[in-house]
Amino acid sequence: MDNDILKRLDPEVFEAIANETKRQTETLELIASENFTSKAVMEACGSVMTNKYAEGYPGKRYYGGCEFVDVAENLARDRAKKLFGCEYVNVQPHSGSSANMAVLFAVLKPGDAIMGLDLSHGGHLTHGSKVNFSGQFFDAHSYGVDKETGIIDMNKVEEMARRVKPKLIITGASAYSQGFDFKAFREVADKVGALLMADIAHPAGLVAAGLSANPMPHCHFVTTTTHKTLRGPRGGMIMMGKDFENPLGLTINTKNGSRVKMMSEVIDAEVMPGIQGGPLMHIIAGKAVAFGEALQPEFKAYAQQIKDNAAAMAAKFLAAGYHIVSGGTKNHLMLLDLRNKNVNGKVAENLLHEAGITVNKNMVPFDDKSPFVTSGIRIGTPAMTTRGMKVAEAEKIVEFIDRVISAANDANVADVCKAVRAEVRELCLGFPLNNYGSLV
């Protein structure tokens, strides 16, 4: 990446970017929601597309001069449709949260009941948390995992649905290492007259590669981020396997009289002008590039390696006496419950940071500690896999983590972290990130 102009004109920002580049280059990124985009994606995101306002949709813009950004957005939409096997897609949401907000506001009224996975059991803020719009505008009810197995009990989900009669049921998670049975959720939704939304922000890349269940045949709406396992720029997206008439009875007047609006029309209007104005066309261009990359055969091999690395790490952790919520992983992440290691999530995160390993503290189901302390850490493999690391490296990384956590309460913990950091740096330099040119 050529940053000579930035270095000369704004050395302070340049220095921040240079230091972040060094951090990414020399340390291990194990946060499950993070990844490294390709140089092509970054070039698109840093292109002249950032200069263009394009309120509206391709062919129906409020501004002139949109003929080329229309090309980029249509490429993104067409590639996403091919990637996920869907009939409708909106690539304009700025984030996964705004994608979720658009769907909820499109199909619900304030006070309507919704159901989603409890945040402390692995869910997401936008699935009904009381500190989020989803729990403030709507009557949110949270289902959870079984205390013994750490897995969602569909019988309890159905019991809750029959009791609260939600208008919308949300599947998906930010810290759940098992899959979702979309068919079973749809059966529950149909029994209570609810719509069903799948938030696949975390496993989207695995879904695209055919290595995780595709929700399109069963869910009315599918939302996702475009980074994480999909390895694109930070952003959001809304999809539907099949378009359908909106169930709210919303109509539109045409030359031939009024008709019921299609759900795609309702969602498009909710994204813009409902909650957003101008889309970020440089990011949409980056999304198009990332979707094109994900359509290549190499991406499926990458996604498989993500799963292989995660499975190897989980097995190694279990062999070392760690407790993994739900007993293992079927995707790209795992949630370690550290209570049997006499260390909390905050301490573990900080010590691992000193050792050059980035993870995030995370609540575990039925946690007795606050979200600022937590009893666990979340670990994911997308970023390390992008570097080219495989099972052997995954197992070595578990050894690094175990050395640090095992020494957490020892007087020499600082020395252990320093020694591990040197080994982590050596490992990372053996799997370089080639996207950043000569910035450092």
UniProtKB/Swiss-Prot annotation:
Pathway as given in its UniProt record: One-carbon metabolism; tetrahydrofolate interconversion; Amino-acid biosynthesis; glycine biosynthesis; glycine from L-serine: step 1/1
Keyword Cytoplasm: yes
Swiss-Prot/TrEMBL keywords: Amino-acid biosynthesis, Cytoplasm, One-carbon metabolism, Pyridoxal phosphate, Transferase
Residues binding (6S)-5,6,7,8-tetrahydrofolate, per UniProt: 119, 123-125, 370-372
GO biological process, alphabetically ordered: glycine biosynthetic process from serine; tetrahydrofolate interconversion
EC number: 2.1.2.1
SUPFAM superfamilies: PLP-dependent transferases
CDD domains: SHMT
Modification N6-(pyridoxal phosphate)lysine occurs at: 228
Pfam families according to UniProt: SHMT
GO cellular component: cytosol
Enzymatic reactions: (6R)-5,10-methylene-5,6,7,8-tetrahydrofolate + glycine + H2O = (6S)-5,6,7,8-tetrahydrofolate + L-serine
Subcellular location: Cytoplasm
Cofactor dependency: pyridoxal 5'-phosphate
Site feature location: Plays an important role in substrate specificity: 227
Family: Belongs to the SHMT family.
Subunit structure: Homodimer.
Function summary: Catalyzes the reversible interconversion of serine and glycine with tetrahydrofolate (THF) serving as the one-carbon carrier. This reaction serves as the major source of one-carbon groups required for the biosynthesis of purines, thymidylate, methionine, and other important biomolecules. Also exhibits THF-independent aldolase activity toward beta-hydroxyamino acids, producing glycine and aldehydes, via a retro-aldol mechanism.
Protein name per Swiss-Prot or TrEMBL: Serine hydroxymethyltransferase
